């Protein structure tokens, strides 16, 4: 009864509806809205797939299905060209849990998620965050978390200046310190 009363007295009479996607694990790792295309959003799930909507969430479609990995840690849209997406695989452990899906590195799409190219960094296992340069979509920083429960020397911050053709680790503390 209290819930109904509070709902009715909400400013602007906001009404929430379930818009999906609904066939997933419910562990959202990343959500990005396209700054250049109103109504276009991407949602990445920790244990399965990347979904896209172009109509403010009324309809969703999976756009990362045929890849050799399930876990996703982050997605980034290039600010200077929103058709360019970077996807970091491997759940990021932003939430406290005992099981996470490992990944296979970083992927790039130049067509809004229709097709994907694998860019390497397979040994990083879990990508926590991706940042794309505001004016040059080929300059990207990736926070690699490595293996969570065993030794891992692939942790650190990686940078590419050529769209993922080559990666350089620009920060590494030790095998116990995740990015």
Where in this protein do the model-derived segments appear?
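Beta-propeller blade termini and top-face loops
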Residues: 1-179
């Amino acid at each position: 009864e209290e819930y109904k009363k509070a709902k009715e007295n909400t400013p602007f009479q906001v009404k929430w509806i379930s818009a999906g996607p609904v066939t997933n694990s419910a562990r959202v790792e990343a959500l990005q809205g396209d700054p250049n295309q109103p109504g276009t959003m991407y949602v990445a799930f920790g244990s399965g797939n990347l979904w896209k909507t172009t109509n403010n969430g009324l309809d969703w479609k999976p756009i990362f299905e045929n890849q050799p990995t399930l876990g996703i840690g982050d997605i980034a849209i290039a600010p200077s060209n929103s058709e360019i997406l970077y996807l970091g695989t491997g759940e990021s452990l932003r939430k406290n849990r005992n099981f996470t899906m490992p990944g296979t590195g970083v992927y790039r799409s130049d067509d809004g998620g229709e097709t994907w190219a694998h860019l390497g960094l397979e040994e990083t296992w879990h990508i926590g965050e991706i940042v794309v340069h505001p004016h040059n979509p080929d300059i990207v920083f990736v926070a690699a978390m490595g293996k969570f429960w065993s030794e891992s020397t692939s942790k650190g911050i990686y940078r590419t200046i050529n769209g993922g053709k080559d990666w350089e680790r620009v920060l590494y503390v030790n095998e116990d310190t995740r990015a």
